[in-house]
From Swiss-Prot:
Disruption phenotype: Reduced hypocotyl bending and dose-dependent altered root gravitropism with an impaired formation of auxin gradients, thus leading to an irregular waves root shape.
Span list, region Disordered: 49-79
Organism taxonomic ancestry: Eukaryota, Viridiplantae, Streptophyta, Embryophyta, Tracheophyta
Tissue: Expressed in siliques, stems, hypocotyls, shoot apex, leaves, flowers and cotyledons, and, to a lower extent, in roots.
Record-given protein name: Protein GOLVEN 2
Chief subcellular location: endoplasmic reticulum
Pfam families in the record: GLV1-2
Proregion positions: 27-65
Length: 79
């Protein structure tokens, strides 16, 4: 005899499994975010140290930025 599972019970079981497993994924994502923020903080401290030691200046950063002038013509489709 084969046991026949209805679609509704299969769907309910699938949703239950997804509901139970979602908090564990959220906890692991929280750890990833913490690790990323630590990396960002470390990188910013390194860049401050380099600037303080004379390895770079703020003026160089302004020259490297992509700047569009204020009087740039708008595209035709926006007129």
């Amino acid at each position: 005899m084969a046991i026949r599972v209805s679609h509704k019970s299969f769907l309910v079981a699938l949703l239950l499994i997804l509901f139970i497993s979602s908090p564990t994924q959220a906890r692991s994502l929280r750890e990833v975010v913490r690790n990323r923020t630590l990396l960002v903080v470390e990188k910013s401290q390194e860049s401050r140290k380099i600037r303080h030691e004379g390895g770079g200046s703020d003026v160089d950063g302004l020259m490297d930025m992509d700047y569009n002038s204020a009087n740039k013509k708008r595209p035709i489709h926006n007129r």
